[in-house]
Every structure is written in structure tokens, then in C-alpha cells.
């Protein structure tokens, strides 16, 4: 479980698995007799987890972008949620903000860091000193952007060690 995602895995009694929702919690019910040692079953579990993350990301992330963009007086075009493992987010020259569904595994401060990072790109489409100054201005704290960037890198390395995304 994370700040934005509650997930429970249960062993089922039926031959097929299921992804369901009980309030804010996603429940993955595994097929009866499923053995996660089998690579095919691992692929099934990965697909179901990805779908749970996608659904939750579509609920949670666009409103965060909307609220924070409004707070900072910024305009963006659209928010897209993507199954991207190579980057947490991006901002296009058209003002589209793309966010990885895998952000649902991150602590809330890092989710906001990625959102702020992409919002800063609406004004500065690079990582210049002006970009970092814009990001720090969002936080009202000099150096906060680079601090959170390093924290995000450490989080990503930890996920890789655990064989997550």
C-alpha cells in the first residue's frame, strides 16, 4: 500500500482471477491453484497490477495536476496516464502532461514532485537554472527541487532492486 493506492491480494476459489474494487481498495483475487513461481502466472499478476495502477492513476493524477496548475496560474492542455517505465513524467511542447501509472507506487511527496517538475516545463522546456528556480519557487524553498530529484532517483533504484516496474 502507498499514499495513493490500497491493494490487497487474495487467494481465490474459482479457476479465473479477478480485479475488483471495495471502496478505495483494489482487490486482486488470484485464481485457485495459481502458483506465482510459474512465469505465465507472473505475467498475469503483472497485467492485473498494471490495470489497478492505471485505474487509480486516472482517478488521482489529473485532479492533482489541475489543482496545482490552477494554484500556480499555469495552463496545460491535457493529462495522459501511460504505462511508461523509463520516465515518471514528461511535458510536450503542446502543453500535454504525461504521467506514468507507476507513480502510484511512489510516496505522495514524490508524486507531487513529478507533477511540479512537469508543470515547471510549461515555462521552461529544459533543465536550465531557470527551470530549477521555477521548481524551487513552487515549493518556496531554494534547493528543494534538486533534493526531491535525488530522492526520486533513490526511490527508482529501490524499485529496480525489488524488480518493480
Regions found by a protein language model. Name each.
Residues 115:
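Walker B beta-strand of ABC/ABC-like P-loop ATPase nucleotide-binding domains
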Residues 1-112, 122-165:
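Active-site-proximal or metal-binding-adjacent scaffold patches in catalytic folds
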Residues 118:
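Walker B catalytic acidic pair
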